Curated annotation (Swiss-Prot):
Superkingdom of origin: Bacteria
Taxon lineage: Bacteria, Bacillati, Bacillota, Clostridia, Eubacteriales
GO BP, one annotated term: DNA-templated transcription initiation
Name the record gives this protein: RNA polymerase sigma factor SigI4
Motif Polymerase core binding, residue numbers: 87-100
Regulation: Negatively regulated by the anti-sigma-I factor RsgI4. Binding of the polysaccharide substrate to RsgI4 may lead to the release and activation of SigI4.
DNA-binding region as annotated in the record: 226-245
GO molecular function: DNA binding; sigma factor activity
Subunit structure: Interacts with RsgI4.
């Protein structure tokens, strides 16, 4: 049985693969790209505009950074968080607003680091006040230790060994992607944005992964065998072409040893069939 740390790591990878992560703020909010400005500078600039009263920008910022917030919450809790029904998400969202309102670039420096600290702090406070979480070990323990972690968390070294094994599997998956000319960054930018589209692509990837002949041809040619695949799926050819990278990535996962991620894709298909 996979331990808590393994599940957390896989869920974090899952969130990454779902396309929901940090987007380039210059593209989202219309802030002109300045030369020699880092991403953190751009985010800080957005926060300053929000603090100066730009309500619409704040709403856009919260909406677009929802995936990042979910990643923090999920990592801290050690499981996937459903924003529609999760009390923890509400706690995290309030903490995210708190981070925006309380951020001072001259004091706090980088917003994402500051936000991570505030949200982690609030989620851990929530865990401490709820007995149902008494046995949960926050994922932040498995990252680099800092003063915050030393203050709140307790060591349990046997997780570290299995963490290494999972990281090796993830790295192997990343190397497989590179053989197809795909990077993890490509998945962030090119994966389907809508839930229905993602679930459709997952079902296509499963058909591809379960057909040994097609899958082996894909591995050999380093591309989707479109002509053969189109005879097995009832979708437009352009749908497959447009989501090629995501479909390849999911099919590789489904043929991998990443059982927790595979379980998520199975659940996605079951929801789609209902």
């Amino acid at each position: 049985m996979l331990n808590v740390q393994l599940k957390i790591f896989c869920h974090a990878a899952l969130i990454f693969l779902e396309v929901v992560y940090l987007f380039e703020p210059n593209l989202i909010y219309g802030v002109k790209k300045r030369e020699k400005k880092s991403r953190s500078d751009s985010i800080n600039h957005i926060i300053i505009k929000i603090k100066n009263g730009d309500i619409e920008l704040k709403e856009k910022f919260i909406k677009k950074y929802k995936p990042y917030l979910l990643k923090i919450i999920s990592s801290t809790l050690g499981r996937y968080v459903d924003p529609e029904v999760s009390e923890e998400y509400s706690v995290g969202l309030m903490a995210f607003n708190e981070a925006i309102d309380g951020f001072n670039p001259e004091i706090n420096g980088n917003f994402t680091n500051y936000c991570n600290m505030v949200v982690n702090h609030r989620i851990i406070d929530y865990i401490r006040k709820n007995k149902k979480y008494s046995n949960v070990i926050p994922f932040s323990y498995f990252e680099e230790r800092n003063d915050f972690e030393e203050k709140y968390l307790v060591s349990d070294s046997h997780y570290l060994y299995e963490n290494i094994e999972v990281k090796e599997e993830i790295l192997q998956f990343e190397q497989q992607l590179k053989q197809f000319g795909i990077t993890l960054e490509d998945l962030v930018m090119n994966s389907p944005k809508h839930k229905d589209s993602r679930e459709l692509c997952i079902s296509i990837a499963r058909i591809l992964s379960e057909n040994d002949k097609l899958f082996e041809k894909m591995i050999r040619k380093k591309c989707i065998p479109l002509s053969e695949l189109m005879g097995l799926v009832n979708v437009h050819r352009k749908t497959v072409e447009r989501n090629r990278k995501f479909i390849i990535a999911v099919s590789l996962i489904l043929r991998s040893g990443l059982d927790e991620i595979k379980q998520f894709f199975r659940a996605s298909e079951e929801r789609r069939e209902k």
